């Protein structure tokens, strides 16, 4: 799959190029030209899935064409091995606290 810059002023990139570069030459973010649609079954059963399984299925929609399923699953489960609390902000708004991971980055 090819990736484009959100600023649309840089050459297309492969997944490897996008990951290694981080940002496109025009300072845009790399996005895939197409993202596989998640099936309705995913949404119907999302409340029964672990955070890691949800992340894997979403990552597969972005990268599945370029990364073998078992490799992608291993990457997701290794990198998201920490608790992610779901915190109520207001009556109908919740937030995932992603900053509890080892890098405190999110």
Language-model-detected regions and their locations in the chain:
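PLP-dependent amino-acid enzyme catalytic core
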Residues: 1-106
């Amino acid at each position: 799959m090819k990736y484009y810059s959100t600023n649309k002023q840089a050459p297309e990139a492969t997944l490897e190029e996008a990951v290694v570069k981080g940002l496109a030459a025009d300072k845009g973010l790399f996005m895939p030209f197409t993202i596989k649609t998640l099936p309705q079954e995913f949404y119907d059963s999302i409340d029964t899935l672990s955070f890691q399984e949800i992340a894997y299925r979403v990552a597969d929609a972005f990268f599945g064409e370029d990364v073998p399923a078992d490799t992608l699953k291993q990457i997701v489960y290794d990198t998201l091995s920490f608790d992610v609390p779901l915190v109520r902000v207001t009556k109908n708004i919740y937030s995932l606290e992603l900053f509890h991971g080892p890098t405190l980055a999110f």
